[in-house]
């Protein structure tokens, strides 16, 4: 795999090359200064940032803040609107350029568009967080905005991929709309430090695109071979042991409350669900629920830990299996596909925690640092053995990218099903979607 810097040297930032992300900014006005302050605070403190904190950081009284925005939601709406305007501009500009003469290689065009999307996501980190980890809100306009898919960039990516197929670069059996959606969602994740950390957006975007296009595996593995691996069997063995916590015994109050809370959080959303709602659904008094599980934050932490332990069991079993690094990477993707399919409520609740955490949090979630160490070790083993194409100088950056790619977006999983989602993961992580040179 080529180094992430290879195609970006000597070129202007991708956001300038495609679509000019940030043109919507009307710097100099007091309103814009407040928006910049709010975005900076949310990036460092998360969505729990209050109006009082925004006013203090902007150097104005809270009352003066209301002259510009009548609520915190109004600030969030404006941040999201500007973010979406910049994404649309990138997509529209890229689509317009598709009709222009361009002799550059197909992967360079895909990487350029991906980098532009990634840079826009980094620039609008606070808005990205609200859109990427969308959650219920009492404000209908905010809900509508966060649920709008970035159609312009998806269409631009789809048309770029179609041009790549016409040229013979993209494999004929790859579903291009699904791939375009996947690439765009992946590029937007670059705006979150869990993917990018200390690397530049251009570096990470190029690395992600090269993994998706070329694959990690030095030799392209077949589905039948991967299905027969010891690692895949180990993953299935753990998946079969996963219990459905919704079937908790009502006599076990703690387990019963946790099971009810999962369903209520998944149905209503973490932010808007109250302890009173959980108590009512569980048929218990509010005081009893508080005694059993403590605060809502403690309940969220407990649910996250339970979900993380299920995934951890799969990782441990796969990594201990007698299998190659490529087979283990495949089996870990299968663990993730099944975890998302079986425990979608828990996954959405985990996103609620992500919404409350700053987008520059580098190691979110339960046991992420452990997963990162394990992935670095697995990738290093594969590179030494010649099974995995050599990545960038930083194994940490490669590991963060691979962990992110192994989680299929839920909308894609629901649309295609578990088996097709696994094949998609194999195509975009191991084999690559581009035709390999013989």
Give the location of each predicted region.
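Helix-turn-helix
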Residues: 33, 37, 43-74, 78, ...
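Short, basic, alpha-helical segments at the C-terminal edge of helix-turn-helix-like DNA-binding modules
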Residues: 81-88, 305-313
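Amphipathic alpha-helical segments used for helix-helix packing
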Residues: 118-144, 158, 229, 328, ...
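Amphipathic alpha-helical packing segments from all-alpha helical-bundle domains
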Residues: 130, 140-167, 176-180, 184, ...
